[in-house]
Amino acid sequence: MNDIYTQAQHQLDALGLRCPEPVMMIRKTVRKMAEGETLLVIADDPATTRDIPSFCEFMDHTLIASDISKTPYHYLLKKGL
């Protein structure tokens, strides 16, 4: 795993969860975070490759990095306003 992912302040294991569960879990986790904090999401649902970027855009969070070249997928999000 790239070093950028190890710097995340929070981590969410969404392995085995299927749409819409990963995004629901992300939303619940992000609500508890402070603005600017980061969240590493580890998932294996192929739908997350479109759902997580869309969620970030819709909710004004930043998708800092993603690795979807192989499973499990890794996403690094930064909480927005």
From Swiss-Prot:
GO annotation, cellular component aspect: cytoplasm
User: Please, which domain of life does this record's source organism belong to?
Assistant: Bacteria
In this protein, the active site sits at 19
Q: Name one GO molecular function term.
A: sulfur carrier activity
Q: What keywords sit in the KW lines?
A: Cytoplasm
What S-S linkages are listed for this chain? none
| Key word Cytoplasm present | yes
Per the UniProt entry, what are the Gene Ontology biological process annotations, in alphabetical order?
tRNA wobble position uridine thiolation
Subcellular location per the Swiss-Prot or TrEMBL entry: Cytoplasm
Q: Which protein family is it in? A: Belongs to the sulfur carrier protein TusA family.
What function does this protein fulfil? Sulfur carrier protein which probably makes part of a sulfur-relay system.
Q: What is this protein called?
A: Sulfur carrier protein TusA
Organism in which the protein naturally occurs: Shewanella frigidimarina (strain NCIMB 400)
Q: What is the lineage of its organism?
A: Bacteria, Pseudomonadati, Pseudomonadota, Gammaproteobacteria, Alteromonadales
